[in-house]
């Protein structure tokens, strides 16, 4: 799944991912109570964890 960040996010190493960056979801973890967290990676290879409220997903049909 691909998406865009909806706000600035700082990863565990202190690297900031800016609002509007294109990201890919690599892995999804269920946290319980209908909450989920994903492992995302930016186009430049920066990995970060985030809940799905910080990502707007891009959905498109196959051509």
Model feature map: region roles:
Residues 20-22, 34, 40, 57:
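General N-terminal targeting signals
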Residues 17-28:
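Conserved beta-strand/loop element in small beta-rich adapter and peptidoglycan-binding domains
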Residues 1-9, 29-30:
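SH3-family beta-barrel domains
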Residues 41-63:
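Intrinsically disordered, low-complexity, charged/polar segments
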Residues 7, 21, 41-45:
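Secondary-structure transition/turn motif
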Residues 29-47:
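SH3/SH3-like beta-barrel superfamily modules
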Residues 18, 33, 63:
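Residue-level signal for functionally critical sites in structured catalytic/ligand-binding pockets
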Residues 12-16:
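Short, surface-exposed secondary-structure edge patches
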